[in-house]
Amino acid sequence: MNASSADSDYLGIPLSPGVYILHLVLPRPHYLQVGKLGSYDFLPGDYLYVGSASGRGGLRARLGRHLHGSDRRHWHIDWLRLVATPRGYFYLESREHLECVWNQALAHQPGACIPVPGFGASDCNRKPTACAAHLHRFELGFDEDLIRDSFPGGSESNIVYRKFTPDFQPDFSDIE
């Protein structure tokens, strides 16, 4: 970990830039408007959303916003966050642009499917290796170790996964 990791205070999320995966759970089906993408049926399951954080506040600011939720709908994930519950997150501190690389690795995991084409991938359509979406659904769960081991750019020792349990569901109201 780098020096900025010492500045972390909220759930150990650093202020540095990096790539992350937000783990959300949807216990029952929802029909949901997703900004300009349109309205979609979201089936129950585990949802993993791949993003990057390179702006002010780094990973802590971006993950904090997603964990807490926001009244302002800016990103596609803000719409899903209205009905889905955070269950955890992966992250890697890095200045490398690994978002699409991680997304491609996640897309090849057993049981992964794309619930909404284009979800979270607005920036990808300008790249030669465009991603179909940055949101993946796993109906029957996923293997945390298998996923972590498949992420390029890191190793098991520097890719962090924090999982919330029914006994530990943090209060996200104190983060911005």
Task: Describe each region flagged by the PLM.
Residues M1-G64, H68, T85-H97, R137-E176:
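GIY-YIG nuclease catalytic motif and its immediate N-terminal context
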Residues A3-A6, A53, A61, V83-A84, ...:
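A sequence-composition feature that detects small, non-aromatic residues
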Residues S70-W75:
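Cytochrome P450 catalytic domain signature, combining two hallmark sequence patches
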Residues W79-R126:
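Mid-chain, well-packed structural core segment of small domains
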